[in-house]
Amino acid sequence: MLSYLKQNLCFYLSSKILILALAISAIVSACTTFYVISLEAKNFSTIIGFLLIDLAIFLILGILLTQKFFSKNNDNDSSRLQNRIVIAFSLVAAIPTIIVSVFSVYFFNLSVKAWFDKKISTVLDQSVIVAETYIAEHKVQLKETALAVAEDLSDMYYDLIHNPALFTKTLNTEADMRSLDEAIVLNKSTNTIVANSYLSFSLSFATIPAHLIKKADLGEPVEVKSDPTKIRMLIKLKEYNDVYLLVGRLVDNKIIDHIDATNGAAAEYNSLKNEIDNIQIKFSIMFIFIALLLLFVAINFGVLFTAQIVKPIKKLVTATDKVKDGDLTVQVPENEVDKDEIGTLYVAFNRMIKQLSRQQRDLVIAQRAMAWSDVAKKVAHEIKNPLTPILLASERLLKKFSAEIKDKSEFESYLKMIIRHTNDIKNIVSEFVLFARLPAPKFTKSELVYLVKHIIEARKLLNDNIVYTCDSNVDQFDFMCDATQINQVMINVLKNAEESIEGQEFGRIDVILDIKDDFINVIVMDNGKGFPPELIGKATESYVTTSSKGMGVGLAIVKRIVEEHCGVLDIANREDKGAIIDIKFDLKELHLKVRRSCG
């Protein structure tokens, strides 16, 4: 039970469903982590927890993928090659990524330190201080001016209180003398303007906050912040009942803009400085995820890429194993690979296997021929010695005692049978001897068309029931060959065709000579019985025959002679009826062979 559960658990753990679920979990966890880091109210314990969860998911996913891949590819040498290539791709992707990540984080920290250097902080702080000092100085000056104007107006109380025109004139004089942009005297009780300078804007107590008026009641100038481009001071006039003086000076807009820009830059700088830890965490996490992503992409690319390389190599390994087991018919599909080095290797492998198969077949045939040659020599030697006396004794018996025998016809029949079978044995022995002692060809120039037609004419005389035809695309052709052996080839081929026609009312043998480029084709077709399908591939082997008159060395001799003349012998059955024998000579190879034999 435990083993069953263990097997199912292993299967489940290595299944594609779990891997897909982990991949989705990794994406969701990464997005959640990024969201948590982006929050303004950060909890670093929570961030670290999410980072650990992300790391665990990625590690488990990587382990499962690696285990699944290597467990699938540990069967043979080609799989181990694929593993090595995938590992190489992973290292090539991981090492530079790690190095770049480390240096990027390092230089990022250096840049951050350079951005938030103490000197820069000091400069920004000093700029803010200078701006604030400028405004503060203007406020102090305006406060002193407000006290001075209030003092002057209090001294002139009895002259001004009942003379509004003089009050206004005096106020304008004070404003011009003290460079005030505005000066206004307000009555709190009536909420009216008692007097004001020429450039002053209309103002009422409703626009002044109550708490500022209370502060002004204490006798000290109070700043009224109603316009960012203007500094105003409110002060109560001592001798007057509920009367207040409001003075103001304009500040240059360029200076205001400069101060605002300085304060904004300083505030943004300090905000970034406070967020630097958050930025560093985001940057580091981003690089970690990019590194992991590149690693997974590299592994997947390595798997796909090596699969394309190793797949044809696996087929080669499989084919090689079959060849090792003795199967020389195996071929790898050349059309399934590109015409590159792998394609060239496929072509070379197929050519090599075909050559090995042909050489093995030729070796078997040669060994069989050599064995039969030895047998032929021994058989010929053992049979030939008693054969001659038997033949001579039979002939003498026929001559000497045929007159004395009462049943003369029967006696002659028996003796003629002995003589006939003895001659058959003699012919068989001659074939043995010819096959065993076939001499090397002696190459001379012979007129091939005449040679073939002459042989056909001779065969016509022996077989008047067979129609012979000869068709040639040239009238004459000088062929470098051993004329005797070529004559023997044609006789054997024609004799084989004649034997297949025996017993038929109508026989036909067609001979075609096709001479073009560097090849000669001699084709012999008949309308006989043809070859049994099971003997098509063995017809040229020694002592394979369907005739009762020979030992089956005729076509074997033909093949040997044709090969000695750099030719190929093909045997097949015609579609309708009969057989076709195609002899093809390669003139280039033949001329090279003749040249080597002469040189």
Curated annotation (Swiss-Prot):
Compartments it resides in: Cell membrane
Catalyzed chemical reaction(s): ATP + protein L-histidine = ADP + protein N-phospho-L-histidine
Top-level taxonomy: Bacteria, Pseudomonadati, Pseudomonadota, Alphaproteobacteria, Rickettsiales
Signal peptide: none
Domain Histidine kinase: start-end pairs: 378-589
Classification via CDD domains: HAMP, HisKA
Gene3D superfamilies registered for this protein in UniProt: 1.10.287.130, 6.10.340.10, Histidine kinase-like ATPase, C-terminal domain
Pfam family, one: HAMP
Name of protein: Putative sensor histidine kinase NtrY-like
InterPro entries per UniProt: Bact_Sensor_His_Kinase (IPR050398), HAMP_dom (IPR003660), HATPase_C_sf (IPR036890), His_kinase_dom (IPR005467), HisK_dim/P_dom (IPR003661), HisK_dim/P_sf (IPR036097), NtrY-like_N (IPR045671), Sig_transdc_His_kin-like_C (IPR004358)
Function: Member of the two-component regulatory system RT0603/RT0550.
